[in-house]
């Protein structure tokens, strides 16, 4: 994924504030063998870019001054209540140095699994991203995990999945095999509530309702007393 950046001449709080007024976002590029570079980006283009998953979890190509440089998004500072990026940080990428990144997990197939289709269980996505280590060329935009084999009472751990070639899981907080997905049974009470809610959501035919009411009234009417 590519984006365009421009060299930034001034730094400081005042200069950054004036830059934002003109529709630009201040940033910095650091790492590698070069010195840190002050940059600025068009805020409108940046705002659309940050909505894409690939912008957060893949090696990016930054075009600046007629040259292209490979970088990673490392930090994004947002305004507390405005839709505005206040500052952005990028790190240069060395093709020979391993990266440590968080990549999204894409789950699929759970609707066809025995746990859901046969046993009517709930599937809980415990983790939605995973910390990994790899060379830049091996960095995946996401990791696809098929849940078609899930069964009642089971769970899926990191060691149960096959990571892409060249990718290693990075343990955090002493958890070397965290749970990715868990399966829980739905209680009978919850099933009854769901069925009642579904029945209540079915639209009522006015003619059928009127006919049913008339039939009920007729059945409940008392016969006239004999003289």
Curated annotation (Swiss-Prot):
Per the record, the GO terms for biological process are: translation
- Domain of life where this protein originates: Bacteria
Q: Which GO terms describe its cellular component?
A: cytosolic large ribosomal subunit
Recorded GO molecular functions are:
5S rRNA binding; structural constituent of ribosome
Role this protein plays: This is one of the proteins that binds to the 5S RNA in the ribosome where it forms part of the central protuberance.
Q: Does the keyword Ribosomal protein apply?
A: yes
Question: What family name appears in the similarity comment?
Answer: Belongs to the bacterial ribosomal protein bL25 family. CTC subfamily.
Q: Which CDD domains match?
A: Ribosomal_L25_TL5_CTC
List the top taxonomic levels of the source. Bacteria, Pseudomonadati, Pseudomonadota, Betaproteobacteria, Burkholderiales
Summarize subunit and interaction data from the UniProt record for this chain: Part of the 50S ribosomal subunit; part of the 5S rRNA/L5/L18/L25 subcomplex. Contacts the 5S rRNA. Binds to the 5S rRNA independently of L5 and L18.
Q: What is this protein called?
A: Large ribosomal subunit protein bL25
Keywords of the record, alphabetical order, are: Ribonucleoprotein, Ribosomal protein, RNA-binding, rRNA-binding
Keyword hit for RNA-binding: yes
């Amino acid at each position: 994924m590519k984006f365009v950046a421009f060299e930034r001449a001034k730094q400081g709080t005042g200069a950054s504030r004036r830059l934002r007024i003109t529709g630009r976002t201040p940033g910095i590029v650091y790492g590698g063998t070069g010195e840190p570079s002050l940059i600025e980006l068009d805020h409108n283009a940046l705002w659309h870019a940050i909505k894409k998953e690939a912008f957060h979890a893949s090696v990016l190509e930054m075009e600046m001054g007629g040259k292209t440089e490979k970088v990673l998004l490392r930090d994004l500072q947002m305004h507390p209540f405005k839709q505005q990026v206040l500052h952005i940080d990028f790190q240069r990428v060395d093709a020979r140095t391993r990266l440590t990144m968080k990549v999204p997990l894409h789950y699929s197939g759970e609707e066809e699994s025995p746990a859901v289709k046969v046993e009517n269980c709930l599937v809980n996505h415990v983790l939605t991203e995973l910390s990994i280590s790899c060379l830049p060329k091996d960095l995946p935009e996401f990791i696809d995990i098929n849940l078609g084999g899930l069964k009642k009472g089971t769970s899926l751990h990191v060691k149960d999945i096959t990571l892409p070639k060249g990718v290693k899981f990075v343990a955090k907080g002493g958890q070397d095999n965290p749970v990715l997905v868990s399966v829980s049974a739905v209680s009978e009470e919850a099933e009854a509530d769901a069925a009642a809610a579904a029945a209540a959501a079915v639209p009522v035919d006015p003619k059928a309702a009127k006919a049913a009411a008339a039939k009920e009234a007729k059945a409940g009417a008392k016969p006239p007393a004999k003289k």
